[in-house]
Amino acid sequence: MVNLRKAVHSFLVHLIGLLVWQCDISVSPVAALVTDIFNTSDGGRFKFPDGVQNWPALSIVIIIILTIGGNILVIMAVSLEKKLHNATNYFLMSLAIADMLVGLLVMPLSLLAILYDYVWPLPRYLCPVWISLDVLFSTASIMHLCAISLDRYVAIRNPVEHSRFNSRTKAIMKIAIVWAISIGVSVPIPVIGLRDEEKVFVNNTTCVLNDPNFVLIGSFVAFFIPLTIMVITYCLTIHVLRRQALMLLHGHVEEPPRINLDFLKCCRRNGTEEENSANPNQDSNPRRRKKKERRPRGTMQAINNERKASKVLGIVFFVFLVMWCPFFITNILSVLCGKACNQKLMEKLLNVFVWIGYVCSGINPLVYTLFNKIYRRAFSNYLRCNYKPEKKPPVRQMPRVAATALSGRELNVNIYRHTNEPVLKKANDKEPGIEMQVENLELPVNPSSVVSERISSV
């Protein structure tokens, strides 16, 4: 406890000296802190360099804080907001967990390497572990986006079949598969690095993956193949949505089977009852015929919801593509061209491009905030320390209606409506009749629209 107190005191002294621009500090605050705690000697393996070389890089701490905080807000929103409880948002929450771990475990160590001019300042056995975590979370990000793209395409293409396998448990199983693939890609790195340090060190000082075969195979498995699948399925999703919208606009959509009691007569004569029902396939009422010809509002609204959600996810895909492609393309070129390329230039480009990729982990919450009202409202509440979900207004339900169907009365009940309110039409009240209880009726307009609306709450 005494050693820890001395270490903290030493760290604060050096930090205050830095803030007042006393540049004669020979040992960095972080180096002094860790050195005092572990009390390492010059002959040990754990030895810091002489001092920090790049103090302006500390400004990157702002990016790290925003990345961690933004993704925590996403995780809280999906956990607390019932409107966000669907398969796509579960994937987005898992993606936010991966991005948050990038900010917690990967970006700080990368910043530390920059501060020491890319000379690894920590124990050498931590280098392959850090590279493995970097590959794990980067692979998890692209795999999540690929899985989201596939899941949404299947949901829009075959909504009924997808709804049978779209429970919360099935979504968790899909997410577990994504993480299993990501772990499988990253696990070989510490094994390779601990066996041969040359595979994870360049010039015996810089911690970077130095195995050409693994770089090539890993780049294709973890990035280019999932990226190709993601782009193809996203384009197919947009194509299906456009085709469905055009079919609705031109009236070439098949109406679902429905129950339509067009004409119901209840007669009571001399103790006998007769029921006559008109042919449901014939409709002589012109107003009713016009209503039939209208397009289903639920289906069109569902397609609009899907298109809005696809735009948001499309922006996420595009940002990921733009911010990670430079790194992976440069990584492949540095291996393929070998000594023919300027390796120092390649290293500098990779150092810049990898941080552009890291920034992508902090941009996704910003995309959700700008383009989704539910996320925006949730983030605003959480920043004001309001963690309770908003109470929904009471739902207006139709009371039970007691209708007396007189003898000879014409009771017209139309069940196929876009609301839950049955429609009772004219009656002849000259003769006594029977009493009917009309309950609340809830019939879906279109099964595909119901499924689609449940999916597209992004």
From Swiss-Prot:
Primary subcellular site in the record, as a coarse category: membrane
List of glycosylated residues: 203-204
- Single GO molecular function: neurotransmitter receptor activity
Where in the cell is the protein located?
Cell membrane
Q: Which GO terms describe its cellular component?
A: dendrite; plasma membrane; synapse
State the name under which the record lists this protein. 5-hydroxytryptamine receptor 2C
Annotated GO biological process: behavioral fear response; chemical synaptic transmission; feeding behavior; G protein-coupled receptor signaling pathway, coupled to cyclic nucleotide second messenger; locomotory behavior; phospholipase C-activating G protein-coupled receptor signaling pathway; phospholipase C-activating serotonin receptor signaling pathway; regulation of appetite
